[in-house]
Amino acid sequence: MEEQVANAIEIASNPSADPALKTQAFEFVNQLRSDPSGWQVCLSLFTQTPQRSGIVRHVALEVVNSAAQGGLIDLQALAYVKDGLLAYLRQVYGQDAGASDPPNIQNKIAQTITFLFSALYASGWESFFDDLLSLTHKSPSSTTRDNASGIIFYLRVINSIHDEIGDVLVSRSRNEQDKANALKDLIRQRDMQKITSSWQQILSEWRDGNDVIVEMCLKAVGSWVSWIDIGLVVNQTMLDLLFQQLGRAQKEDLRQGEEKVRDAAVDVFTEIIGKKMKPEDKIDMIIFLNLDTIVSQLSNSPPLHGNRFTFKYDTDLAETVAKLVNITVIDIVRALEQEGVSAECKEKANGLLQAFLPHILRYFSDEYDEVCSTVIPCVSDLLTYLRRIAKVNPALASQHSSILLPILKAIIAKMRYDETSSWGEEDEQTDEAEFQELRKRLGILQQMIASVNEQLYMEAVSEMVATTFENLRQSGSQMDWRDLDLALHEMFLFGDLAVKAGSLYTKSNPNNQAAERLIEMMLRMVESDIRSFTHPATQLQYMEICVRYSSFFHHHTHLIPGVLENFLQLVHHPIKKVKTRSWYLFQRLVKQLRQYVGNVAQTVVEALGDLLVIRAELPSEVSEGDEMSSEDHDLADAIFNSQLYLFEAVGIICSTPTVSPDKQVLYAQAVLNPIFLDMEKNLEAAKSQDERAILQIHHDIMALGTLARGFSDWMPGTNTPATLPAPEVSAAFNQVAEATLVALESLKSSFNVRTAARFAFSRLIGVLGSRILPQLPRWIDGLLTQTSSRDEMALFLRLLDQVIFGFKGEIYSILDTLLTPFLQRVFSGIADPTTGTDDEIQLAELKREYLNFLLAVLNNDLGAVIISERNQPIFETVISTIEHFSKDIDDFTTAKMAFSVLSKMSSSWGGPDVIAEASNGAPLAQAPLPGFGQFMITRFSPLCWALPSTPSFNSKDAQAKQVLAEAGGLQRTIYAKTGMEYLTYLRDRELPGMGMGAELIEEFVGALSRLDLKGFRQFFPVCLSNFHHSLDLNMNN
């Protein structure tokens, strides 16, 4: 059997083995894992002499592990495994050992031994640590820990035990944590003294002999210290040993691996300080350990001081020391801010804070971002503490300037690009993203400083920015771009303090002192020569700042032409990342300064002409050599989406009130006519399904719609603009609608063309106003085709709601004409079968938009169109779909909306109220629809009981309750319109027919006639529950 298993493992792991044979071997080994006796064979395979191959032994031990952890080995058998492995350990790692196992096998044995410890240490293997410690001697009579392989294995297990029971980062169940705690208690009670003594012996005897042993031992001390008696580690003997290892930091040249020992020694101190203690004890511990001196010595050591700013600088040690500084300062601050801490302790903590401030600044300002990031948590805690003090006593804020100012200066310095950074290069993207993330974190710290001492923050930043612009004035393009970028970045952040409600001003006056400072900075920046902004990063910052603080230009209008000229240069930037971002920023700027830019409309249209040429590119056409700075800009459609901002910007500038209507038309046509010609040129190819031609027409239509958006502020969902564009302008855009419709009618099978046309339609509404209404049938015919998805239908329904809302006084006749064919397409979309979750989501959305459409018609006094002579044939289908939705147990949202529509129909067509309090707070109802009262009673009323009668209906569900409340509202509306006729019908026919008892019927009818709308909506769910309860009782009887 052993040979069979060994062969199977060899075959399964052999890359050149026959695939069929290999599959069989895999299956055999996997079956072995679940075989209750498989572990016995594998234990023998692992321990036998001569040793099997490494892969056989590794897999065999893995099977034993799996069986033990999977519960296939009982306690008695575990003792057998323990004995077998212990004998093996004594043979391989003990006094007569030869070569020990490779690291992967050692790790696997340590894992198994750790599991056996968890299972048997409490009962069955009480001598666990004695047995392992025996491996550390070369002979039983030896008094020194002199067996290197045994010591390494012992320490490997020690560290593995901590991972199993002591590591707080490991997630454990409540039972697992209880077991871990019990094992820790047992160790502390039985063996902790001898374990810590063993560490002292190992560190003493091997301090210069074997770096691997010393590093492993230090890691053990550092990990275990969090849950053992601190006195076992913090004693003179152990501290002397630790200080010896720290001494390695003073060496100029370390042998390979020695730096790991040094860093592990520092980590021990970090773990000691990280141990949970009372604030008083922690402060005393920091003082006792003399951590200030330790950190000073480490900071002044050759790797961190002598080699700083050279390629030999030891960043690993810097980060390790920074961790120690971080945890120490966090504890110092905690002692300062916690209530109940003695005055004496706080005084000591204050002294320590002053002592550690240079250490904080040293590592916070480290040129390596990883080191700086390590101390950000303690800086954040410190600033949070100072902010809390300043809130309680603002007078103290100035006293802390000695702490705040150096930290602020360090923050500002760290926000600067370092000398080695290469902005925008493809292979630097990860570094750039990490630096921007660091800037965000630093920005938060800077805000905290501003909240503690605003004046100090304003003065420091103002001085830095002013100095930078003065240097720029003197040195011009010779200035280091990193300095200018830093000043601009600080200006951008400064707005968090200066801007209120999106502006620097309140009633023409600066918001506050910060706004005054920022206005001064803006003047310096805008009056600088843009040619001095030689770097793309500073050019982008310039534009971002102009856009963010556009309110500045409302009060300095004389500067606008110069800024626009600068932007028009930058929108032609050779680097695509800058160019495409500048297109968006240009649109933002002119939108915010619309009232001041009309006088340069012609200049802008001419300057942007070359950028308004549309060239659609299929993915395969994008040139591989086309240099772009980020993934977003590698895609041609992303560039086109940015290009659209230019079309909107042109529309904004050309449509300002200072541009006469005839000039508006002239400028618009200068942009429109090339697009019309392009559409005409590509239409025939597009009809022949040429993909590039279709995409070109999609782009053309999107550009037309975006230009229209620039010409009108109107957005779907809002009322029509107070003043539409001049008739001449609307006439020009009527050509846009016509060109779009011609393309749509020819290419309506294309999803892309339909998408673009729907976008254009939504934007043309604001420019054409009611002129668009006669075209509605053509839009519907093109946008709702046989191939249109439910999503497209839902989106168009939403647009139509907005058209109805905007033009309710003018749309009736057109709506009357198009309603039947339009709704028939919607009904077809609803009826189509669904395949998969996405389809079901789209169907639910379409149902809701259909109901929303009906509500829009009814709410805008257009309900007559649904019951007009022309649309009479589909009335029954409209009602039946709503009835069907009201009974949908799987979609409460739609069911609730269905009842809302029925209530609105009832209040609209049911005639005047015969009972006070009409539902929905509706205005005067339309003329009653003959026979509709009886129709409501016989068709609508029973629906209120249909959904809750479904077996799976849960009346306690929150959404279900909302549906019932809406159904109750419908019943109250029917009663308001029909009065006693409805009560009689309920009493004599509907309720008895459902099996409702006479007493409950009278209660229901009485409540309906007595309660108002709100009261009955609350009553109906309760009544329904009582009714179902009575039915259950009758069935049981």
Curated annotation (Swiss-Prot):
GO terms for molecular function: small GTPase binding; tRNA binding. Disulfide bonds: none annotated. Keywords: Cytoplasm, Nucleus, RNA-binding, Transport, tRNA processing, tRNA-binding. It is found in: Nucleus; Cytoplasm. This is Exportin-T. InterPro entries: ARM-like, ARM-type_fold, Exportin-1/Importin-b-like, Exportin-T_C, XPOT. Belongs to the exportin family. GO terms for biological process: tRNA processing; tRNA re-export from nucleus. The keyword Nucleus applies. It comes from the Eukaryota. The keyword DNA repair does not apply. Its main location: nucleus. It comes from Neosartorya fischeri (strain ATCC 1020 / DSM 3700 / CBS 544.65 / FGSC A1164 / JCM 1740 / NRRL 181 / WB 181). GO terms for cellular component: cytoplasm; nuclear matrix; nuclear pore. tRNA nucleus export receptor which facilitates tRNA translocation across the nuclear pore complex. Involved in pre-tRNA splicing, probably by affecting the interaction of pre-tRNA with splicing endonuclease.
